[in-house]
Amino acid sequence: MKLGIDENYFELEENLLKEGYRFICGVDEAGRGPLAGPVFAAAVIMDREIIIEGVRDSKKLTPKKREKLFEEIVKESITYSVAMVDNKTIDEININNATFLAMKNAIEALELVPDIVLVDGYEIPDLNLPQKALIKGDRKSYSIACASILAKVSRDRFITQISSLYPVYKFEKHKGYGTKEHIRLILEYGPCEIHRKSFLKNILR
């Protein structure tokens, strides 16, 4: 069943299916840029018979719409997984390596081994699976767009949940991103244990 979505948005997956790939996995991250908290990644293999209406790049959706789509994607997926890498590891291995690690962990936690992985951005090093990297892939691939929503909602929920542990920073409002208010609070109170120290060098110097 296809529900009101541009056909070219699923064209990549359709072509891969014709080439014989059965389990097509979309992978995306959330939280590369924030000053605090973990980076998340999601991997998902969607049912090719069901296209969920309204799936797009998660950054272009309202939080309410993302939450609704999250539940639909979870329900209609063949298998999905979400992984995170914490701020301390980000500081140790850098954000690029941390993002790739989260992506690999998410893929490896799937209940099925993908035939091919579609990844937003750049190829994942040492993946040992066929993969295709797409710049701005969440705008070009339905599977990546679904993964984008899973990663974004999962991270937002996590940050909102732990915000009560650090109330002065108001993480529930900015989700760790470098807003003017967040930077002001860092300068006033100093960083807390979930801040990425490697991201604060220019702010705290």
From Swiss-Prot:
One Pfam assignment: RNase_HII
EC number from the UniProt entry: 3.1.26.4
Catalysed reactions listed for this entry: Endonucleolytic cleavage to 5'-phosphomonoester
Record-annotated RNase H type-2 domain positions: 22-205
Top class in the EC scheme: hydrolase
Listed cofactors: Mn(2+); Mg(2+)
Compartments reported by the entry: Cytoplasm
CC cofactor note: Manganese or magnesium. Binds 1 divalent metal ion per monomer in the absence of substrate. May bind a second metal ion after substrate binding.
Cysteine disulfide links: none
Entry binding sites for a divalent metal cation: 28-29, 120
Coiled coil: none
GO cellular component: cytoplasm; ribonuclease H2 complex
Assigned keywords, A-Z: Cytoplasm, Endonuclease, Hydrolase, Manganese, Metal-binding, Nuclease
Protein origin, superkingdom: Bacteria
UniProt main location, coarse: cytoplasm
UniProt keyword Cytoplasm, yes or no: yes
Any one of the GO BP annotations: mismatch repair
Any one GO molecular function term: RNA-DNA hybrid ribonuclease activity
Chain's role: Endonuclease that specifically degrades the RNA of RNA-DNA hybrids.
PANTHER family tied to this protein: RIBONUCLEASE H2 SUBUNIT A, RIBONUCLEASE HII
Family classification: Belongs to the RNase HII family.
Protein name according to UniProt: Ribonuclease HII
